[in-house]
A protein has these predicted regions:
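Conserved ASCE/P-loop NTPase catalytic core
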Residues: 1-124, 272, 284-285, 290-292
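Signal for well-folded cores of large energy- and translation-related assemblies
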Residues: 53, 64-71, 180-183, 187, ...
């Protein structure tokens, strides 16, 4: 496991510095450090999102290729070479909700990330815990040591190969329903950047990729001893958290109230009516929500398909 600093170019993954200019402590880049199998931790992914658009596009493009197990970088040093990496790389990143602003671009190119969003309702308890931790020196390192010892004790290093947790047919179907819901709810809708009109025919993301990720998450939790009920709760939360936050608020409200007024969503979130209505329209395009104008107000209801899949996945 490698902790990354600021990643401001693809050179951070595979360095192409000429041999004569390399420092004694040069690592060759993050992918050389983890080798054929490992993990990269990015404690502030928000700083990457603040880069210039071209830089960001190149970094996200490299990450998408790494997801598929290979990445190559062409360089001009030492007469011109191509650097290659092959393997499995897990990435763990902490980021603010600003990542939702890049959702359409990321989703249109093929989403790879899954999300776990922390509840922001109990600010008092978070502040209390922060005060307690600030008066306990070394708690971060103690926590690292505990987690490392736990995984070492179970022989769960990235270098080891473990059998996956067996899944029954019923469990597989439940994960598939979660994946189908998650993929539709996070699918991109291509809009004109100025008029906001929808461009082109609907292209809903297939559920294969996120279903596989959710299945691996569920199996991993079962292997380390997480109770089955909690495994399902957390897997279901990650599935729904992987859509943008505003979409999640609309879906949750439509389910809880058997239909919700767009004005109510505006009041809860502080988002303008135009943005809320476009977000409802995005979900409607992918068959998650259906809208209806009643008395001059726009109401959102979950579709029959959504009701059916939610019952199968979150029963």
């Amino acid at each position: 496991m490698v902790e990354a600093g600021l990643i401001d170019s693809t050179a951070a993954f595979l360095s192409g510095t000429a041999k004569k200019d390399q420092a004694k402590d040069a690592t060759g880049g993050l992918l050389r450090q983890i080798g054929a199998s490992g993990g990269i931790i990015m404690k502030d992914f928000t700083s990457i999102l603040s880069l210039q658009r071209d830089q960001l596009r190149k970094i996200l493009g490299a990450m998408r290729e790494m997801y598929d197990g290979r990445w190559s970088r062409s360089i001009g040093t030492d007469g011109g070479r191509v650097l290659h990496w092959y393997g499995r790389a897990a990435m763990f990143a902490k980021v603010t909700n600003v990542i939702d602003q890049l959702h359409e671009a990321s989703a249109a190119l093929g989403e790879r990330w899954i999300f776990y969003r922390f509840d922001d309702t109990d600010a008092y308890e978070k502040s209390r815990r922060a005060l307690i931790n600030s008066s306990t020196p070394g708690w971060r390192q103690d926590l690292r040591d505990l987690v490392s010892a736990f995984f070492m004790g179970m022989d769960l290093s990235f270098k080891s190969r473990n059998d996956s947790w067996p899944m029954t047919a019923a469990e597989q179907m439940r994960i598939i329903s979660m994946g189908e819901v998650a993929s539709r709810c996070r699918s991109a809708v291509l809009r004109d950047p100025y008029t906001k009109e929808i461009l082109g025919v609907r292209e809903t993301e297939g559920g294969t990729r996120i279903t596989t990720e959710l299945g691996q998450l569920w199996q991993g939790m079962r292997i380390i001893g997480v109770p089955e009920k909690l495994c399902w709760q957390l897997t279901g939360k990650v599935a729904l958290d992987s859509m943008p936050k505003l979409r999640r608020v609309i879906v949750d409200s439509a389910i809880a109230k058997s239909g919700v007024d767009a004005g109510h969503i505006c009041g809860v979130t502080g988002v303008s009516k135009g943005v809320v209505r476009r977000t409802i329209e995005d979900l409607e395009v992918h068959g998650v929500i259906e809208s209806m104008d009643i008395g001059g107000k726009t109401y959102a209801f979950v579709t029959k398909w959504m009701e059916r899949e939610m019952q199968k996945g979150w029963r």
